[in-house]
């Protein structure tokens, strides 16, 4: 199959590109490199350094005979969305809508969209949250992802486009950007590389459902290979406090230092843990990488980058 991966030089997208290519698919990547890095790009992928809103994208889709779109280019920072909601909406709603219109006009068969579990569900009323949990986002980022999901549902119903929404829990792993606030594991790893203490926001008892990017890539392969139209959580169902995460990472690193605590962040929910039962029962996917194994892989990646 000929697949377009947007954001394919980025953290999650680059792993998906690798997985698709290993499975024998032909992959085209578009990335404006605002956060992606060429060093993460698989050399077997065809690469175009353009923005999704560039009119040339239609010609790229035509010339590469694209059958499926996997849309991972996005604004991913909750804090940035609070500062500039308009930029967030342009990135996560308008660009998604542009791609959806291209997909319909060119009769592309499938559209896979990277969404978010934690930010869409907001403060959970039950644990773990399944796909039927009320959506009550606490940030413009969560709002924009939910709006994009609704557009996918519309395009599926109105035009028959096969659409798959994957709602990720907190993804971590190699290639993650340590700059900003989106990836706490990467931020902690970078500080440890400098022999600095990890800084935990608030009291550290807030919880997240951490999932390895390798498991996310496998979920995207299943979404491509199966007719799984709809919305699916991709998570571990395991709840980990930020304090516990820091302790585990310090143990992995062997560093004889402790974590510090800073101020709490606006827009953060207190608990987040996601139920992946629907995706598992429908298509057999389940997480394979333990938290500690994933932290070892991520820490070693940052260590090798430093060396």
Locate the predicted segments by residue:
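Generic structural signal for alpha-helix termini and adjacent loop/cap motifs
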Residues: 15, 36, 84, 102, ...
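A conserved pocket-lining segment of Rossmann-fold NAD(P)-dependent short-chain dehydrogenase/reductase
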Residues: 81, 132-133, 163-177, 187-211, ...
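Conserved donor sugar-nucleotide recognition element shared by glycan-biosynthetic enzymes
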Residues: 140, 148, 181, 242, ...
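Hydrophobic alpha-helix immediately C-terminal to the catalytic Tyr-X-X-X-Lys motif of short-chain
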Residues: 147, 151, 155, 188, ...
């Amino acid at each position: 199959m000929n697949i377009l991966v947007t954001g394919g030089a980025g953290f999650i997208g680059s792993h998906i590109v690798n997985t698709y290519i290993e499975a024998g698919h032909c992959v085209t990547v578009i990335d404006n490199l605002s956060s992606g890095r060429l060093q993460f790009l698989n050399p077997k992928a065809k690469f175009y350094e353009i923005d999704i809103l560039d009119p040339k994208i239609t010609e790229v889709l035509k010339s590469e005979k694209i059958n499926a779109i996997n849309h991972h280019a996005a604004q991913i920072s909750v804090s940035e969305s609070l500062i500039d909601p308009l930029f967030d909406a342009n990135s996560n709603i308008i660009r998604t809508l542009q791609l959806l219109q291209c997909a319909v006009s060119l009769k592309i068969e499938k559209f896979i969209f990277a969404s978010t579990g934690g930010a869409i569900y907001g403060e959970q009323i039950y644990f773990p949250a399944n796909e039927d949990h009320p959506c009550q986002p606490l940030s413009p980022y969560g709002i924009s992802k939910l709006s994009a999901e609704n557009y996918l549902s519309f395009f599926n119903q109105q035009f028959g486009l096969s659409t798959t929404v994957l709602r990720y829990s907190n993804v971590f792993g190699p290639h993650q950007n340590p700059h900003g606030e989106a990836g706490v594991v990467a931020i902690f790893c970078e500080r440890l590389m400098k022999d600095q203490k990890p800084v935990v926001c608030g009291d550290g008892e807030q919880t997240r459902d951490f999932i390895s990017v390798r498991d996310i890539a496998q979920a995207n392969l299943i979404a491509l290979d199966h007719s799984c139209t709809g919305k699916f959580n991709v998570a571990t169902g395991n709840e980990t406090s930020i304090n516990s995460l820091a302790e585990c990472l310090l143990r992995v690193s062997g560093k004889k230092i402790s974590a510090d605590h800073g101020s709490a962040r606006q827009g953060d929910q207190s608990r987040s843990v996601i139920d992946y039962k629907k995706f598992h029962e429908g298509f057999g996917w389940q997480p394979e990488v333990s938290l500690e194994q994933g932290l070892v892989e991520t820490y070693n990646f940052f260590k090798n980058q430093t060396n």
